[in-house]
Amino acid sequence: MEERGPDIEKYGSQPCTPLSFDPMLPSTSRVATPVRPSSTLSARQAPASPFRAQPQNMEPSISRVHELREGAAVKRSYTNDWMQGNYIPPNPQQQQYQRPPSMIGSTISNMSNLSHMTKFSALSVNTQCGQFDNWIYQSQPALSKVSHSSVENQDPMKRRERMSIPEIVQSLASYEMSDQVAAIRELEPLAKAEALESTYCQADLGKIINALFEVLVPRPQENENVIRKVFEILHRAAVPKHVRMTEKIFHSLNLELMNTNSSKHSFQVPRPYSIYELVIERASRLDTAYDQAAMLLLAQICCKPFFMKYVFSEKEQSAGHRRLHEVVMQFAIKNLQQQETKRKSKGFCVSIIKNLSRRNRSIWSIVYELHVIPIFHDIIKDEYSDEDLLWPTMQALTTFCSIERVGEDFVKLGGAQDLCNLLYHGSTRLLHELLACMQRLSLLQEIGNQDMEESIRRVIQVVGSDDATIAERATGVLRNIGQPNKQNKVIMVRNGVTAHAIAVLRTSMRFQSQLREQQNARTPKNQIDAAKNQILSIYENCLSILNNVTKMGKDDILDSAIQACRMISANPDAAIVLLHFLNAGAPKCRKLAVNVMKRVIENVPAFAEPFVDLPGTTQETLPILLLKRAYESLDEWKKAVVEVMRSEPNTQQFRDAIEKRQDHEDIVWKSVSLLSNLCRNGNPRFFERVKVEMLYTRPTNPFTSLFPEMSDVILYEWLDFILAICGTEWSLQNCLMYHFLKQANITHEYLLHYRRPNPQICDKIKNIIDTGMRQQQQHNQLEQMAMMHAQQQHQQLPM
């Protein structure tokens, strides 16, 4: 039997014939789609064919025809309503089609009324505008250029002419929507391409911007989508960084509206007024098509540096500007208080409050008097708050809480606990701002009256983060929070803060590797320096935490401090970590490390045993490092004293010199104090190492380092160190004190010059003099005995 091809009529196809060019007739390259495969092979003949008919494709043809006819009828109604201006868009969730309608149906749709409406059959054929934009839902895709099928219908001899400036202004001022749409379609591509300033001169651009703002003045009959498009054009005109001409036009128009005597513009608005109030009036109309676009423009013309400088600066204190500042802040606060306000709009309001409050102290006062702190507290308490709202709120809180009384107001509301409840949030940028705010709050006295146990536990859980910013700020919170309330340190110890701090220090090389990656990537030097300072801050914070929880001041809870010392001594990494920072750390880290070691060894003497043979980074043991650090810091202390004397009081240089002097003073007296303890009470090998270092390796005489300008605390510990190393059994037998005094050529009368009002120092000097005199007598006796013994041996020699 002879095979036949598929029946053409069966599928309703039409023969193709060439037509002459007609600009009013759209064309298409889409062919009709058959409802089933055209192959004559049966399923048995081609069982493995991927094109085999599937059950879902084998529906009765009548249902398919019925569906396509209904679709064509809906499409015609949809297009007719659109063209007659009666179109009401359906709900986006219920919308069937994702494209704007075509002005004219496609060829196949007109011929067969069976083609389903798709993005290929819903084409723009407007030959006057190469870009058909979506006027209803911004989320819908729009044609970026004229489609190929529409290009076929354009007359190549007819070129599109640009609208003149008077035509644009007149069209925008018109009450006819079609005229406004034509002007907007002229401006929108230029605005999106950021080409308005390069296309128009300043005078022409000023006329256009003024006309756009005039469209925003409420009218009896207006289209919300036109208003939205106007807001978008104005926003795109102002958003680029380098559009000084546009910014000046905005500012000039604003000043003219604020001037009650100006009659230049015919805006039907009360005087005084401003472009800000024009935008605010539109933004306050919630649930409109343009409220979000209005808020976006308002945030831009409030927070951009140019407008903050010339509109919201503290220098602008005229009556009109003060009134404007109050209007903007009142609107922002009111918007935050309304439940109906969209969360994105609330985020814009918070950003406006944050930026303008930082720039202008009077605006800060206006906002504070409008009770902005309870509003911020409500935002962070709301578990459904969006990240885009929480993030600027955290930034604003950090700004406001830098003022002590404001921070205490926030803490009294329970704000610190509510902030810590957000520590489980997945946003990194949010955690950065949250912990920065908590660092400020943790220094306030009011936080001592709050129950912070759960909050402290949550902060401890994030200190081990690989994010250096989170680690720095979390450790900063723990460093501060124990000061206002000593009970907080008990909570920290109970939750294992010592182990967490040591673990961060033990694994700190991960931060160094991140820093090396930045250096290899040729990151700018200022960012490299910031990263180095951040890592140093992490070290200081962790060592400060260990220092704070082991502190035994008069207000501290001794049981907790002793427990912290025991926990540190039991940690297998503690000794190597503390020795490393004494060896290679910055001065502040050295001070904290030696202080922690001193306290732990004094309370748990067994903690000294690991240091007997433990080498540091430079292969030097603890007693040698303590001796080196004491002498190095003593020299630095002398230099810092001179810097303090040469610096002007109340200057940064003076404060830096004071801090440097204090750091090195602490290193000196704490190092020699710990060394004295080790020589007296520790393993005898500690003294052996000190003896070899001072007498043989690097001959050192402690008396030569004494000088009258020594502070009391250094002098006392230095004298005690001399007594400690000269009071051992070996030293007494070998008259080490007398050896040092004789070598330094120091008399007992000279030592009396070091007496101070402090009786403890006087006692130390007296003990040194007494010990020196006894050892001198002992030395003289030994010499006499040696001389007598020599004489006896000489006499016994045969003549």
Curated annotation (Swiss-Prot):
* GO molecular function (one): protein serine/threonine kinase activator activity
Q: Where is the composition biased (Basic and acidic residues)?
A: 1-10
Q: Which InterPro entries does the protein's record reference?
A: ARM-like, ARM-type_fold, Armadillo, Beta-catenin
User: What are the ranges of the ARM repeats?
Assistant: 454-496
The record's subcellular locations are: Cytoplasm, Cell cortex; Nucleus
**Which UniProt keywords are given for this protein, alphabetically ordered?**
Activator, Cytoplasm, Developmental protein, Nucleus, Transcription, Transcription regulation, Wnt signaling pathway
* Regions of compositional bias (Polar residues) in chain numbering: 26-43
> Which positions are tagged coiled coil?
none
GO cellular component, alphabetical, reads: adherens junction; catenin complex; cell cortex; cytoplasm; nucleus; serine/threonine protein kinase complex
Choose any GO biological process term that the UniProt entry carries and state it. Answer: establishment of mitotic spindle orientation
At the top level of its lineage, which domain of life is listed? Eukaryota
- Region of interest called Disordered, as start-end residue ranges on this chain: 1-60
What is the documented function of this protein?
Answer: Antagonistic role in the Wnt signaling pathway that operates in embryogenesis. When located at the cortex it has been shown to inhibit Wnt signaling during asymmetric cell division but when relocated to the nucleus it shows positive regulation. Has a role in blastomere signaling during endoderm specification. Component of the beta-catenin-lit-1 complex which promotes phosphorylation, down-regulation and subcellular relocation of pop-1. Within the complex, activates lit-1-dependent kinase activity. Can substitute for bar-1 indicating functional redundancy.
Could you describe the subunit structure of this protein?
A: Interacts (independently of ARM repeat) with nhr-25. Component of the beta-catenin-lit-1 complex (also called the lit-1/wrm-1 complex or the wrm-1/lit-1 kinase complex) at least composed of lit-1 and wrm-1. Interacts (via N-terminus) with lit-1; the interaction is direct and activates lit-1 kinase activity which leads to the phosphorylation of pop-1. This promotes pop-1 interaction with par-5 and translocation of pop-1 from the nucleus to the cytoplasm.
**What is the recorded name of this protein?**
Armadillo repeat-containing protein wrm-1
